[in-house]
Amino acid sequence: MSYIAGDKGPAPTGLEPSTWLDGADHHCFLCRAAAMYDDQQIARRQCLVVDEGPHTLAVLNLYPYNNGHLLVAPRRHVGQLSELSDDEHLEAMHTLSRFTQLYAELIKAEGFNIGLNLNRPAGAGVPGHHHWHLVPRWTGDSNFMLVTGDARVISQSIDELWSAIQAKKGWPQRHKDTKKKHEEDLRKWGKG
């Protein structure tokens, strides 16, 4: 399994960011997801971004433990919990809360594991970009669904779940002017 060996995987097909956030790691898939693109809609789809705010974004995990496995991360490339701003902390917690509500309705999740791994010894696969895992759970799911030798037993494809989240009325656009706010932030950070 290439992702265990540290292969970060390919960039989204045919897309390169037009603007990276200040301090972004160009090899980090979360920084790539937070970047600005000429075609933002296609980029968000290919980067599996299902929600974003001024300080954080939520990305479906390409290698899920369970259906709906979500990563919530700050837009900034920051590796330690103590380095997050109050706004980043608050927005991340709000995003996690919103997704527990959405997943309870959309995929009938009955419970959730929410956690984070700080640094490689604790299991962090992306130690340079802090992120929380939200893993939906169901009664009798036997901990996590099996992942054996590149064969994953997941009840719904990532494409189907991404589309279902987008189709949800009023979802995910919690910030009407996310792109405008992001562009303002880029100018403020000296990148616009």
What positions do the PLM features span?
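Long, well-ordered alpha-helical scaffolding segments within enzyme catalytic domains
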Residues: L84-A109, W162-A164
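A short glycine-rich, hydrophobically flanked beta-strand micro-motif that places a catalytic Asp/Glu
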Residues: I107-A122
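Conserved His + Asp/Glu catalytic blocks
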Residues: M1-D25, P127, V135-W171
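A short, glycine/Asx- and small/polar-enriched loop/turn
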Residues: A124-H130
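Active-site microenvironments that recognize anionic phosphate/pyrophosphate groups
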Residues: M1-N67
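Short, low-complexity, charge-dense intrinsically disordered segments
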Residues: P172-G192
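Divalent metal-coordination and catalytic microenvironments
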Residues: C28, A58, P74, A92, ...
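Short histidine-centered catalytic/ligand-binding loop motif
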Residues: L70-M93, G149-I154
